[in-house]
Amino acid sequence: MKRISTKEINRLALPAVITGVIEPVISLTDTVMAGHIALNTKEVLGAVGVVSSFLSALLWIFIQSSRAITSQVAYAYGQGKLSQVKGLVAQILLLSLGISLLSSIFSFVCSQFILERFYDAEGTLLEYCLDYFHIRVWGFPLTLLTLTIHSIFRGFQNTSWSMYISILGGVINLVFNYIFVYIFHWDIKGLAWASLLAQGTMFVVSVIIMYQKTPFKFFIVKGIHPKFLQSLRMSADLLIRSSMLQGVLYFSFLKATLLGTDGDHTIVATHTLLNQVWGFSTFLFDGYCNAGGLISGRLYSTRQYESIRELVRQLFYVVLGISSAISLIYFLFYYQIGTLMTENTDISLLFYENFWIVILMQPITAITFLFSGVYKGMGFTQVLRDAFIIATLLGFLPAFYVCENLLEWGLSGIWAAFFVWIVFRGGILFLHYLSFFYKRSVQPSV
């Protein structure tokens, strides 16, 4: 058995942690800035949450085509056959470009219908949503292509390039958020323009590095690559999984919006903050989960099952330790975090009533993400799809019905259902891992 060294894990994980933190920081920066805009704070904060939710849904649904390419590149890297996937990478890049442009155009044209019909936005909230949406939607193609390129970098066993690019984007977003909001007084439009500028910069730099450091490029390939259909099948599995994820998140935002009475947007604004904190937390340990996926994909290509078991054991304790530390910090600075997020008293009080659920979810979320990352890396997309369907249908929906319709817990009911959902997701993958990998014969290291 070839034991994966801690140094190798950290080489991939630490840059991925920083990259992962920067991504939600860009979104979190918009949220914090919105929470400190004095005029119509609740509506501005709600608009940022609603639009960010839709764009994230769009992104994480269509990003699955690029997520699948990571395992394909990792396989080729492990076998020393990168030249055989040049055409496949080019076709995935062109596919991402076409999908993203069509999606942005369609979303821009139908923006008011989407916000009114699916998010129940109206009045002042709708006006702010449209202002923010009409700018941010054009960042979608830039972000999708950037993340596709970063997926290629990860399959290439390099996470440092993505880290440098993400840091650059985060700094640009932070600086121009301040300039556009506090100096130019563009308010919510300033938030949108700062994000778009950061996304454009990250895309340009990503393309430059891809051309200079990897054998992959944008070019038109004659004929379909032999592995293109396999990649599409894996993408379809992840697409179903991601669609259900975004359906759950959309459902939660819709319910949070409907829970508000007489135009009060306190609940949806608070739900936005809780989602942002939860998302930020996951990226603190998701770098190690991603590293597990990259290494496991390489090991699985040569059937090194015992090495995979040892890798998972190492990472299990790492992510559990990180998530437990996050929970402890959140408990110690419980009220300070709420004050940092917003100065609105109503939102702060509701935040304090529900934040403890987010804290308790951290260790379970970390373990769930670990097995998700490992399974993505090995290309076990059907297992991920099926686990998600079961967790949603048998976990989230029944829990949501009980908490909201029978117990009437309001926002607490939404997050209690999230808790049950994440337990189901992690539990199913853990049981599958035990049944699959502990029945496999040990292969010699190569």
Question: What role is predicted for each listed range?
Answer:
Residues 1-16, 73-141, 172, 183-236, ...:
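Short alpha-helical transmembrane segments in multi-pass integral membrane proteins
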Residues 6-8, 12-13, 23-24, 57, ...:
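Hydrophobic alpha-helical transmembrane segments of integral membrane proteins
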Residues 14, 30, 69, 110-111, ...:
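Hydrophobic/aromatic residues in alpha-helical transmembrane segments
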Residues 17-71, 136-143, 233-298, 319-327, ...:
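Transmembrane helix-bundle signature of multi-pass secondary active exporters and lipid flippases
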Residues 45-105, 146-162, 268-332, 366-379, ...:
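Small-residue-rich hydrophobic transmembrane alpha-helices
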Residues 63-66, 135-154, 162-173, 191-206, ...:
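Short runs within selected transmembrane alpha-helices of multi-pass transporters and secretion channels
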Residues 396-404:
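Hydrophobic alpha-helical transmembrane segments in multi-pass integral membrane proteins
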